[in-house]
Amino acid sequence: MEICRGPYSHLISLLLILLFRSESAGHPAGKRPCKMQAFRIWDTNQKTFYLRNNQLIAGYLQGPNTKLEEKIDMVPIDFRNVFLGIHGGKLCLSCVKSGDDTKLQLEEVNITDLNKNKEEDKRFTFIRSETGPTTSFESLACPGWFLCTTLEADHPVSLTNTPKEPCTVTKFYFQEDQ
């Protein structure tokens, strides 16, 4: 293949750079077009998520209750980091530290308004790690704390800093909702 070195080669190079630049380039400080996607999520014990009294619960939904299943809304920030929410991205999952206690909260925030470069939005960021068919989510604000469920059904979705403990489940199946 021969490289063209004519009078317009610099102009062509510039146009190609502009055409193929990253989607966040040219947007102010971390603002980028957000593409929210909805996913089905269930843990390795087949428990799905549902909302009860403004708390995210993991349990076995059957029959007419299957319509209570919450889809997880996800906005990718970069290759591994994501924002997670429910209810069309209007309630976002966050990791909050209070003294020695670290807990998962649902906050009324629009997921597409979050900004990866804002320190106050760090609590909404999760590191998505895939291992084979399963996915785990580690808090960026609280390293070592993972999204988890318990072995028992109908308990709150929470965070754990002991992901290998046998009574917690930190591996999830994650499938784009059709």
Curated annotation (Swiss-Prot):
The keyword Chloroplast does not apply. GO terms for biological process: carboxylic acid metabolic process; cellular response to norepinephrine stimulus; chronic inflammatory response to antigenic stimulus; female pregnancy; fever generation; immune response; inflammatory response; insulin secretion. It is found in: Secreted. Residues 1-26 form the signal peptide. It comes from the Eukaryota. PROSITE patterns: INTERLEUKIN_1 (PS00253). Disulfide bonds join C92-C142. Keywords: Disulfide bond, Glycoprotein, Secreted, Signal. SUPFAM superfamilies: Cytokine. One of its GO terms (molecular function) is cytokine activity. One of its GO terms (cellular component) is vesicle. The keyword DNA-binding does not apply. Glycans are attached at N110. Anti-inflammatory antagonist of interleukin-1 family of proinflammatory cytokines such as interleukin-1beta/IL1B and interleukin-1alpha/IL1A. Protects from immune dysregulation and uncontrolled systemic inflammation triggered by IL1 for a range of innate stimulatory agents such as pathogens. Belongs to the IL-1 family. This is Interleukin-1 receptor antagonist protein. It comes from Rattus norvegicus (Rat).
